[in-house]
Amino acid sequence: MKILSLSLLLLLAATVSASVPGLIELVDSKTIFGNVAELLEKEKLSINYANCRSWHLGVETSNIIDFDTVPANCKDYVEDYLITSKQYQYDSKTVCKEAYFYAKGLALKNDTVNVWIFDLDDTLLSSIPYYAKYGYGTEKTDPGAYWLWLGTGASTPGLPEALHLYQNIIELGIEPIILSDRWKLWKNVTLDNLEAAGVTYWKHLILKPNGSNLRQVVYKSKVRKSLVKKGYNIVGNIGDQWADLVEDTPGRVFKLPNPLYYVPS
């Protein structure tokens, strides 16, 4: 049975009302639906995202985008997810395990260099120490503050699951390429960060030109195109933002969890 639209029902009601006076009184739409805010609250759809786990799911699936900060009421949830419960580690392990199984089953080309592209921040290295200082993403910081923090030589510890994948990829005969949106200005501190995490080998470490304001998704897409033109066979990509993984992305992509911030894609 087809469901009549609201407008059609109102039209029918008006017709019947005209032919039979007093039978039906049309009701104003405001009376029907009430206050929108009250409806949202009633249906648990308010922008406060009282269910932080559902908010997080929306972030990871790219249904919730363009958020400036983590909802204030989700601070404890994010801290528990990242630190206390170890769910972050479990989720990352699942992603990296699937990436390894995929890579292990590949028929690699013999006439070219097979490469796997790794994002850097919150893929191989963690920014959690920085965001922990600002309410686990609930406090808004100045643009560029993270990069200035990096410049102080601050520690960005390695993320064990992605580091394990990195080692496995090398053992499979696939060359790792690290593609970061850090400016070349931070090359020395980046090398220190990587060495401290045990990352000492790569085919290329690609950093963004100093002062570049190119959007991350555009910048990384251009780099991938350039690598393909040079003859590299990109078999896989892994990152914590969809901006790392969309637009002209050869090979399969693997998305790591990150509830701390959003990079437009």
From Swiss-Prot:
A single cellular component GO annotation: cytosolic ribosome
Biological processes annotated in GO: defense response to insect; response to copper ion; response to insect; response to jasmonic acid; response to oxidative stress; response to wounding
Secretion signal, residue range per the UniProt entry: 1-18
Tissue: Highly expressed in flowers, but also found in leaves, vegetative shoots, petioles, peduncles, and receptacles of floral organs.
UniProt-annotated glycosylation sites, renumbered to this chain: 110, 188, 210
GO molecular function, a single term: acid phosphatase activity
Induction behaviour: Expression is enhanced during wounding.
Pfam families per UniProt: Acid_phosphat_B (PF03767)
Top-level taxon of the source organism: Eukaryota
Sorted UniProt keywords: Glycoprotein, Signal, Storage protein
Reported function: May function as somatic storage protein during early seedling development.
PANTHER family: ACID PHOSPHATASE-LIKE PROTEIN (PTHR31284), VEGETATIVE STORAGE PROTEIN 1-RELATED (PTHR31284:SF19)
Family to which this protein belongs: Belongs to the APS1/VSP family.
Protein name, per record: Vegetative storage protein 2
Organism encoding this protein: Arabidopsis thaliana (Mouse-ear cress)
